[in-house]
């Protein structure tokens, strides 16, 4: 077994080709100075590799739900398991984020409310009742017998069609205003007012019960779920929707969406979900005489910007008003909608999509400008910053801050509203859930998941938080722990958790709670990797890996890797030196004196207990306390706003200041910019100076470049391909790859020609702050700004790194650096919130030095902090506590550190060791033995399908074979239970929307509990679908990787001349102009975008400074006027004379033009002539032929780059009628064409018919063979029927065309690749993609071993090629379509795909992996399976034949019989299965023969003759051509069938795939048993009395099926992000038919019960129905009598489906001679079924039929009359073909 995780050759970011090793199930602590490479190793390498490998094995719809990580640059990875990461993402919180939404508590609550909530009418608060049909019947049943009942259905007014339909159905009366009126009076007008149709009047008694049911269901159908019942002067109204009888108001059923304030449909109509109502106090705030266009509302978005102009114009268009209308002239309704929105108002808007790079149509929900502001206020910790002057806000009076609709707010669950739960603390919520009575299983599962999530949050020290608390108001530590809680609830084993400084924000007292949670994860059997600086956490670690020795370029090496004790004793790293106190942060010898005091009173925000605190000025004050004690509430939410108010207004009622203070700098963790374009160099205002420096270089002036060209944020200098980002997102897995155009440099080539001190502008951005500080020594201003970064411990930070990728601590230090750069003379108060986040102790020392320098300058600093190194150097300490939440909010200490350690507060206890002399070393407990990992997967009370409530254990890290007869429960156990439970458990690690996608098709398994699970990968044969568009290479993503490799390092060549292609760029165009048109003039234009509105685009371009437009071969001013018609309008970029000195201007203009459009048109005036030339960026050969740019990632999957002939499919579809003459015997050529293409004209067929002399009314059966062939293939003058049908098919959807009429051939133009021909000419080492796809694994391996570039990608491809070799598919052509593979090859390809992840600690579930495999192929596949176990995985296989029994480590045998008599766990060792032993007793006399020839790339056979009326077996290794030979026999057989039907009258081809079944297919319909039984039931007296027709005895007709479950007998209960639950339909009781049908009974069974009866029972009960006895008897003979008559085909096991298929076609054979072709049909059968099959095959032969079967089982070869042994994969011929040498004939 793999006992180590090893990653070698890591070169990610600054990591220097390092190798890292650690053991599974360890807590590994990554430490080192800030910027040393810890996160690069943990997240960008280990996490990225583990996650990507596992996601690749999941369904693609799930893998694409997550933003894929790029492949890390690692040479080799061993022992990695699936990974889950928890990173610091404080700045990524959505504006609406609350504790409830972030931790998914709201999702749990919404689900429970929807499943169990009681709805109430919001106005009357009366409970709403949703009546099911059976509940209505039970209500009516309570009415005394003998009562007259009248059933009525609501009827709309003025609806003539409804009146006519009612008359047609036989209804005669309508109730209008309490008066009964004949309905025929309203035949032409409809009823004048809403009324009620009288459906039936009857006396309630037993004999009328069936009639009552019929009438009730009819009434509900007519009334769309509503009906009225009149009796004894009473009126009752029923509805299948939630309805209040008093008001008749109807409400939708409860759903999770109803309890979300973001739901467009269900949010509060007044505040539009914000929960806040903003009122306008100053009537003059809106300027009445101005219009919206003139910005009459100062708090609305500026209408002069393109964004808001577009939105407001769309709103105006939707509501029918003008933006230029003064506000006072707008109607009150329009004014209200503009300010407060309108319920359900959605407006179409065309906005720019940064992902697509163009404007796209979208829809915006219009909430109103004030409600948009309200959303920001509700979730902000500083509401005042968003509140416009002249307005005030209150809680929304309608929804009371919930943002929910009235209906949602009125709903109760266990007596409480949704808002009640939002206001509870997490501890109170947990207690409430614990007190609930036990629920049914489906509800209990949700509640247990809910409690598990709450338990983790409480264990992490957050019991005091409430779900409604906004994330923006939490401290940094609280945010980190809410994020952490989402990931720690799954009970999986073998997962690698990677945590990013989980101790952030935790007080030392709380850290032990976190440590317990992490220790529990490890003890559960997982690996935990921590990126940490907290000295306490070292006592938790099993291993320490120190990365360093320095930061940035000075780090990236493994300094130490070993136990914590060895680390302290032996390591010389900075971390170890600080831990041993060889280096330390000194306590100041003397504390700074106070310069004044800030006194804050009545602080009561959140949990603060009306505090009064005094904070000294001129000192460093640290605010500390346990988590949740109120630190952020005191400083960020109370003190900061008060100080701001005091400074602005000179007064604050709750604040007084004694001393000088004139400025406040609040440095929080908020991201200063979310754009990828915000970088440290721009933030500290140094980039402008750097750009100016480059603009002053001589080369810059030569090229005509300005300062603007050195910005990657403008099109003048930014790379046009990536827009200045340096990277682009490819369509293969959305990986972000280096831009192939600028190679990550961000800028255009001409910009990079300019150098300063031999460095380009791109080189500057790649420098770290340390490198740049030394580089700019000669530029004092730039040097000073960058040196400030180094002073604050950011020396490792690359100057061009996007700000969004920084941690919270890095952001604060960057902000502090910016503040330090501004010379401040006035006394300033600096407020910092945990600035040590992400800092090593060595960097904390530098930070303290900076803070103390501010103090020495006379400023004041307040720091919220838990780091004891900072606390010990503080001048003054405020400690809040004593606990978190409601038990916190008190001031428990306010003194110096020396005074604090004599108190008994949590901080005092933590601080004492740091003030002791000498300081104590960290406590390292003795290593304790880790609890053993569960040795087994335990399953309790498994009762899926026929499993008999079994309990069992399956060993982990072993190969377990589950054996037993077919349908004994093997598939139910392995796939329906283990796979489902594993999927559900792994999904717990993800947010609800991703979880929902993964488990939406995973039904809740019928089992009490499954423990000991790891992430699961399952491969079922029944789900092994094939896609003809996919090749062998694409199955393992080899094709995508090759595409990426060719994109990155391939060299394009011209497909015409073979010359190297040159790039079309501004430089090449300018060069061409100077070469051929010197001294001429050129006008550079770009076409107007077709999707843009003309006027808005011209206005936009005018604002950008453009002046002219070119159209109709002349120029116009861009501001008009224009003629009525403009032909091909184009924007004029520049007009310039073509001279060498104007080259810079030409380059700049062409660059700008290409940034505006993909094509540029040049209008050239030269030597008295005018010409126009159009250029597109791309590639060009020497002859001027243009090709798309091969370097662009779009080439991977973009419509414009596809082969124009086959449109990217790689094949051409043609219609072939020729082989189907017999099938269409009753058609004429015209009738066939019109039936296939009813919307197309058949007239082109007539000339062909005239030429061939075929009457247009001639049937195909009347046309001779030669004429039919000419009709299909055509003549020299006219297209044939094949070509005409192909042409018609291409004009419509190919998907709607019968697939068996379509013939697919590889596209000649693209050689089957589906892309432009020139792409084939892109080569690596002279080898093209097409050559690779036409070769095998060995060819590609040889090429890749010679490639030195992209080592990580090359290694990935090689590993997958190696896997193809290991599963025995090394011989397969990489471009071969999957559908052309044999069954064995295809299944092994699926295995290879699953095994390609290379992961450990995974459970692999395989379905009969050796079934049907040739003995020579079995060892290689068995070796791969064994290798999986060796690599520390668990493999569980189903094994029908027992072929794996001798190789398995553990055996489970289920049985003893199939179906109801199976499902028992018989033993944990396989029972020996008997092998079929039969004797062939046929005579050896000769029979007619069929001769075939085959010539393909894989097999060459000439004139193979095999006997008819005999059993022939084809055997051989996978890939030897068995299926190809069988297909050839089929084609030859079809040809013979056309010419001479006497040889055999039919051909039946059966493969190993089960019959395709819908949700309605069952045994009774498949074998045509149901019609006879329906006729019988319809003939019964009861049926006639109730007027029930034959068709009503069917669950598949509208009249007969239960209308609530549509005849399925069950309903799916959607539990949102939990697995779907399948429940019997309550209306029909699971019997599928409507209640009326259940009134007709025969032998104690109604028709629904009959469908649930076994075939044995049906055969015995209806022995007199001779027509159904044969199929029933045959099914029973084949041991399928236990199946129920209405058994759904989709619910059968694979072996049962195959047995059904065989029964239909082989055991109920045709009467005339038939050719049976069977392709590995026996591989899904157990040995007993195989014996029965052999008996039947011999019976068929004795009846004169011919059987040819592909089968490697020895018993079939031994019984065959004729044996064909195929050669090895590379032989291309037959080893043996002749009479069976082992068979002695009688």
Swiss-Prot record:
Q: What is its main location?
A: cytoplasm
What domain of life does the UniProt record list for this protein's source?
A: Bacteria
Binding-site residues for ATP 2, renumbered to this chain: 625-632
Q: Name one GO biological process term.
A: SOS response
**Subcellular location field:** Cytoplasm
Zn-finger (C4-type) residues:
719-742, 1602-1628
A cellular component term, taken from the record's GO annotations: excinuclease repair complex
Any one Pfam family here would be: UvrA_DNA-bind
Residues in ABC transporter domain copies: 314-580, 590-913
Keyword field: ATP-binding, Cytoplasm, DNA damage, DNA excision, DNA repair, DNA-binding, Excision nuclease, Metal-binding, Nucleotide-binding, Repeat, SOS response, Zinc, Zinc-finger
**What is the recorded function of this protein according to its Swiss-Prot or TrEMBL entry?**
The UvrABC repair system catalyzes the recognition and processing of DNA lesions. UvrA is an ATPase and a DNA-binding protein. A damage recognition complex composed of 2 UvrA and 2 UvrB subunits scans DNA for abnormalities. When the presence of a lesion has been verified by UvrB, the UvrA molecules dissociate.
Q: What is said about its interaction partners and assembly?
A: Forms a heterotetramer with UvrB during the search for lesions.
The family line of this record is: Belongs to the ABC transporter superfamily. UvrA family.
Name by which UniProt lists this protein: UvrABC system protein A
Report the source organism.
Answer: Chlamydia trachomatis serovar D (strain ATCC VR-885 / DSM 19411 / UW-3/Cx)
